[in-house]
Amino acid sequence: MGKLMVPKILVTNDDGVYSTGLKAAFDSVSDLGEVTISAPAVQQSGVGRSISIFEPLRITKTDVGGIPAYAVGGTPTDSVILGVFTILKAMPDLVLSGFNIGENISTDTITTSGTIGGALEAASYGVPAIAASMQVLDEGQKFDDPRDYQRERFEAGIKVVNRIARNVLKRGMPENVDLLNINIPFHAEEDTPIEITRLARKIFKTDVEERRDPRGRPYYWIAGDLIREEEEGTDVHAIMQKGHVSITPISLDSTARIDFSEIERYL
């Protein structure tokens, strides 16, 4: 009999290698294969799919709650690239990015979230990818030390991700799906309903706050209130209005699904 192949799973995040969310992500797939952690050494939220091309990168061996891990001095995308081409030296069977402390919903986050950015990088190699995020009720928690976030908040999410990851490893991704974006509501339990959703347009009402330093010179904070009401069927509605788990299938191909002759009028 041939030797049974053990799936290789790469885990990353954007909150940094020491986040409790990363350990929860590891726990969610630890029984599914050989798991390797390659994640940013420090907080990298909001960097999207950015890549480091103007400076060298370093890898430091460390541990996450007793689990061996690699801390990368770069972005989540850098962590995936080094994880695949330097640490594993092979394509994994699955990449899991998360758990992010804070929901990643709407088109706002698809291009800005480092959690999703790392998953998109993996998907670009044809590797099935999952991004997993936990809703927070206090927006300030997104900016607190991710090492201090309560581990028990991830229990329901761990079960959801385990089930989905198991099926992805078994069946592969559906046709034309490159990434599954999973968001877990704050009060999720084992029997919380799961919705397959589409992306809402926005999650933030973008605003800019101007302040003055002690010398009277202006500086600025990008800010904005959360949008909590969106159309039925969107990820924002599922999380914010219903308290349901949201799973959004994402494709790398962002080409508008239109008749291309519509564009010829502009030529």
From Swiss-Prot:
The keyword Cytoplasm applies. Binds 1 divalent metal cation per subunit. GO terms for molecular function: 5'-nucleotidase activity; metal ion binding; nucleotide binding. A divalent metal cation binds at D14, D15, S45, N100. Pfam families: SurE (PF01975). Belongs to the SurE nucleotidase family. This is 5'-nucleotidase SurE. It comes from Methanosarcina mazei (strain ATCC BAA-159 / DSM 3647 / Goe1 / Go1 / JCM 11833 / OCM 88).
